[in-house]
């Protein structure tokens, strides 16, 4: 079989990077995935000799490539770029590192979130820590690491850093189930700065907590585009059924919507599902002629199918549970008729079965 990606000598890659007179060939990008130690060392030797904007462009191109090919890993080059003297390079490097959130990296991000000299790098590091809160809630990282990350984020939200960094910290703790999270979100939502309100809505969506439904619904049609956008996204993440008709109504003015808002409405509908959603999205798909919009809508329809299947499975599980409970009641009644003795709720066999169900 012919290899669709022939191995290009890494010296050729480095020469191309250093050649400012020519655009960097996009077909070379994949060579930065899983760098061998020798190649990593060679890249490190010339890294700061590469023009700054070229380094930034390279990392951003690698970031874009990850969206279409998730098998690739750019750990080595992003690790190198974390120590770059240019803040913009470090910012993109943090985002690249966060694509593969190893538990050992949490401490690196915590350190950068606190000590990096640039506000945007700190903000990127704080945002990356949100993934560790999410993983911790799923028991995918150790409780010790989770608590360290949560404590660091709470310290930053309540600290003296810039509003941007503190807002990103609030968004990251949106995943957190600790009781300290709720008052922080409430305080941010009451802030006079709409940036804080937007971050509060973002955190509400991540929490998936129905307590915030009123606040989210109240901002779906906000005159502030940022607040409306975040409320639309939060409605989808929280699967707020009451938002379905209002989001469908928004799609009736598809061409008038901002591109980002349009995308948020479509995706949130795919997360909420329900009557009329599939028909609306499929009808919209037939009207589109832009390839990117078509691809996005097709992905939304795939997600809608997942949503529908999940809800259908939940209905079957509920029906199975109800039938099982009914069978248990019938069996108990038969037992009473056969034994002519009332069953005690203190019966050892019943209690044991109940404990197994709870486990």
Label every PLM stretch briefly.
Residues 1-70, 324-359:
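N-terminal alpha-helical scaffold/docking segments in eukaryotic complex subunits
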Residues 2-12, 35-47, 68-83, 102-115, ...:
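Amphipathic alpha-helical scaffolding segments comprising HEAT/armadillo-like alpha-solenoid repeats
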Residues 90, 94, 112, 117, ...:
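A broadly tuned "polar low-complexity/structure-edge" signature
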